[in-house]
Amino acid sequence: MKHLLLLSLALVALPFGIHGQTVGTLLNTELAFDGYTLVDPMGTGNTHLINNCGEVINTWTSDFNSGGACYLLEDGSLARGCKVSGAFGGGGVGGRLERKNWDDELIWALDWANDERHHHHDFAWMPNGHVLVLAWELKTSEEAAAAGRVNPQLMWPESITEIAPEGSEGGTVVWEWHAWDHLVQNVDASLPHFGEPADHPHRLDVNFANVGGGGGPGSANSGDWMHANAVNYNPTLDQIAISARRFNEIWIIDHGTTTDEAAGPAGDLLYRYGNPEAYGRGDAEDQVFFGQHDVQWIPEGHPQEGALVIYNNGAGRPGCDCSTIDVWNPPMLEDGSYALEGDAPFGPETWAWTYPSTPTPGFFSSNISGVQPQPNGNFLICQGAGGRLFEVTQEGDMVWEYINPEGNFGVVSQGNNPQQNNVFRTYRYGPSFPGFEGRDMTPSEPLEGPDVWGCELHPSQDSTSALGSALLASPAIQAFPNPATSRLTLSAPQPGTWYIYNTTGELVVTRTTHLASTLVDCASWPDGLYVAAFHPRQNGWPPNTLKLSISH
């Protein structure tokens, strides 16, 4: 009788019929960092700034689809990578940077695409107003052979160029770094850079990693070699971090050099991590990064301040194709260099923090994606494929979740499943961000339409008072996708037990979990309505219910 009463109350209370909540903000608790999140759907020219309930604060438009990352600058303008066609056609292609003011007016642009070079994936806006542009540069098969490449072919090594913007378009190049200046090869002593990669761990083995397509990033005729997908600048250290996906490594280089110095030994890698096999100091078993994206230094005030964090995509990871968020502390010395002992690889040997604690198939994006540390100690995660954005605490509990409703064919309404709604990366900015000063932050309705689910904003960042308030109400619970076909992810802000009933009150599944989310196989369930009841483990929390729909 108790279960039937619970079921009937749930069916009456929930606002939708057979369709459930499929897009927009699925979860927003008081433990999430309250701020404004950039959502930049990859297949469109639109960029939206939303609050934690998915309500739109501002929108910028462009004639170009997303070409990778975008950022808010401290004057309230949006800096965005744009996709343009050209001689280079690999995954993550950009080619143009645009800067638009708060009112969506173009105030500066840079075209960085010709037959010799092409911007891609990312850029970094520096405190001095300059911009670091990540780009491919062309090397012919003849140049590859002269550098010692076995089976030489067209290659696109990476370059980073610092540009001082001028006027409304373009700027002056003030610094450059080229990966091609820092090679090593062990195949021909008569060619430059001869030596064993293991003896030159600060250089890049010209014969490591495949080039081109064949299932990887880029087209069949691509010269994409390193496939860097992120660049991050640390002004305190005056160092640059680079994510090189094809090498499964993070590199750090010194920015405190002249361009001439950067072309010599001073421009060699200061540090590298993720795959010791890339420099002959390990094998496949030592690899810890698997097609990673994004890299950021964690800022001061965060529990892991000073460490590095990446989205470790996990394609080809032993055991499962599963993503993780990995944080580690590079062995930096007082002079800004990094410890390297004997013939050992760069450390460390253990993570400072990782999410989830055990990789699970329910969390996976084979490409794109990123992570941003939050001021309250949480991490904002972009699971790029499928446009899923969510926030987790230090304990691994999910406290905010959002599904991008906008894809290549427009915005879907609530209750419908989005298509091609990928998001390259996302960033959140707190209420005190300088770019918001004097701006109209009045929200309009969410992209997907009116919020009938009753999302509430939680502006207080006092986690103690937030927890106290949360004890007065049922915990927010969510299910995705809903309707579901074969697999269903259930999420709650704390551990507990899930009970799922069919419309006759029969118990279908019981699942006790210590994590924020759990994956349920529903492939064999008959089509129809179900009710999930979540009973929190913590005393004082009442149970909560959620309507589910199964439709094969």
Could you say what each language-model-derived stretch is?
Residues 7, 470-552:
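C-terminal outer-membrane/trafficking sorting elements
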Residues 4-14:
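Sec-dependent N-terminal signal peptides
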Residues 20-464:
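Histidine-/acidic-rich catalytic cores in large beta-rich domains
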Residues 5, 277, 433, 437, ...:
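Solvent-exposed, flexible loop/coil residues
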Residues 14-20:
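Sec/Tat signal peptide C-region and signal peptidase I cleavage site
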Residues 459-475:
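Low-complexity, Pro/Thr/Ser/Gly/Ala-rich linker/spacer regions in secreted
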